[in-house]
Amino acid sequence: MLCPSCNSESSRVVDSRSIEMGVSIRRRRECSECQTRFTTIERSVLLVVKRNGVTEEFSREKVIKGVRRACQGRDVSDDALKRLAHEVEQAVRVAHGSQVPANQIGLAILDPLRTLDEVAYLRFASVYKSFNCAEDFEQEIESLRAHRQALAAPPVGDNSEDN
């Protein structure tokens, strides 16, 4: 790391902190030559591979923008959208490492969005899954109902009512 004051390559880390919900590291450094202190931000790059083979950096803002459109008119906070984007980024990092196919980002959005707001989920899914008719919506609504019932059902082997 070059010192911004004297261009020396020799510096030591004085302090390190995780920022941006663990995606980046903020390091406070001190130049060994001139003792100037400066800050660096380090982050692991996540690349999105588009259908045509072109790669670009993952953008939480793009995720938020797409989901915000689906949430238009719904009571969904900006903080909730930021948490969802972070959750999506973490999920694709775990599943795909440093490069993720673009279509996997849309898939990773669906589950947390379904939990956040079912109407927004239907809107997003209708575009992502290219719904063509009312039956597509009906099938997705049935899937939502089944998911909701599965979450509400007690775990198998749960005898809490017997006590």
Curated annotation (Swiss-Prot):
What the entry lists under PROSITE patterns is as follows: ATP_CONE
Query: At the top level of its lineage, which domain of life is listed?
Result: Bacteria
Molecular function terms, GO-annotated? ATP binding; DNA binding; zinc ion binding
* Alphabetized InterPro entries for the sequence: ATP-cone_dom, NrdR-like_N, RNR_NrdR-like
| Cofactor: how and how many bound | Binds 1 zinc ion.
The processes (GO biological process) annotated in the record are:
negative regulation of DNA-templated transcription
Keywords linked to the UniProt accession: ATP-binding, DNA-binding, Metal-binding, Nucleotide-binding, Repressor, Transcription, Transcription regulation, Zinc, Zinc-finger
Q: Where are the zinc fingers (unnamed)?
A: 3-34
Which cofactors is this protein said to need?
Zn(2+)
* ATP-cone domain: residues covered: 46-136
Keyword flag Metal-binding: yes
Annotated function: Negatively regulates transcription of bacterial ribonucleotide reductase nrd genes and operons by binding to NrdR-boxes.
Family indicated by similarity: Belongs to the NrdR family.
Q: Under which name does UniProt file this protein?
A: Transcriptional repressor NrdR
